[in-house]
Structure formats: C-alpha cells, structure tokens
UniProtKB/Swiss-Prot annotation:
A biological process from GO: translation
One Pfam family recorded for the sequence: Ribosomal_L34
Keyword hit for Ribonucleoprotein: yes
Chain's gene name: rpmH
Segments of skewed composition (Basic residues): 1-22, 29-44
Listed InterPro entries: Ribosomal_bL34
Alphabetically ordered keywords of this record: Ribonucleoprotein, Ribosomal protein
Lineage start: Bacteria, Bacillati, Bacillota, Clostridia, Eubacteriales
Name assigned to this protein: Large ribosomal subunit protein bL34
UniProt xrefs under PANTHER family: LARGE RIBOSOMAL SUBUNIT PROTEIN BL34M, MITOCHONDRIAL RIBOSOMAL PROTEIN 34 FAMILY MEMBER
UniProt record similarity statement: Belongs to the bacterial ribosomal protein bL34 family.
Length: 44
C-alpha cells in the first residue's frame, strides 16, 4: 500500500514557506503570532 506522506522539500516550501506566508494578510498574522510566541523557526 502507498504511504500517504511522500515528503518533497520543494512542495513544503511552496506551500508553507516564508514567502507564501508573507504573500497573504492571514499568513502575516501567522508569522506575527509565531514571533510573539518566540518560535525559533517561523516557517518551512
């Protein structure tokens, strides 16, 4: 049986990367929350 998660670095970056987050207002809210929380890594 085929496993459901077939990781690809490019796809992860395209979907959850910093530039994708910055491109929408809600994405920027995500980054803001993660900064306030003190996350070392903000995005993929």
């Amino acid at each position: 049986m085929l496993r459901t998660y077939q990781p690809k670095k490019r796809h992860a970056k395209k979907e959850h990367g910093f530039r994708k987050r910055m491109s929408t207002s809600n994405g920027r809210k995500v980054l803001r929350r993660r900064r306030l929380k003190g996350r070392k890594v903000l995005s993929a």
